Amino acid sequence: MPDYLMRIILNEQQHEKKKQTSREILTCMWEQGVPGATMRRGNAGIDNEDHIEYDILEDAYYNNLPIIIESVLSGDLIKKVEGCVKPLVKHGQISISKGFEETDFLKHEHFIVKVYTSENKKKLLKKEDYEKILTFLQKKNVIWATVTKGIAGYGRDHVIYSQHLFPLSEHMPLVVECIIARDDLPGLTEELNQIVTGGIVFTTPVDLILNR
């Protein structure tokens, strides 16, 4: 059975009963037994009223920028989490993408690979997981791989880490993304799972129209 990627977008200032909605969503996922979730803040975006919001003010919260929450879910968790999250999102967007299945292999030429992990600043003089991942992808001739840092999230330790509460936290979530050609996919996710000491790898088909 494939996994699914749930992606939620809403504005940072959205609240539910005086509590920040994005934080309530993380808590909801945590309570429903979701194994991990990552929250990121966009640098700009268009909201539900067609307003463009920019990263102008020093205190990021007052820019009311878009918040992106992503989580990889098993099929039996989808409806459960959807029922918990949907009532919280008064204005926003929720999408679900189906993960890779063996039947997808010959139907598509490219696949997007997303690795959800975290940084660990306690590993002095040692490579972070994301550095190992980038080195590995480089050997696979991947170009345009990206690493983005989250502002909150949790993983298998089930502890919610937050940049807002703990600005010096050494466990902030990271997302590594890239696109892989079909010929390079066999065995790649298995190798990535060996590199990623704490996190999850998600793969789904994608149409690549330019890569140079």
Task: Enumerate the predicted regions with their spans.
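Positively charged, small/polar-rich N-terminal and surface patches that mediate targeting and assembly
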Residues: 1-212
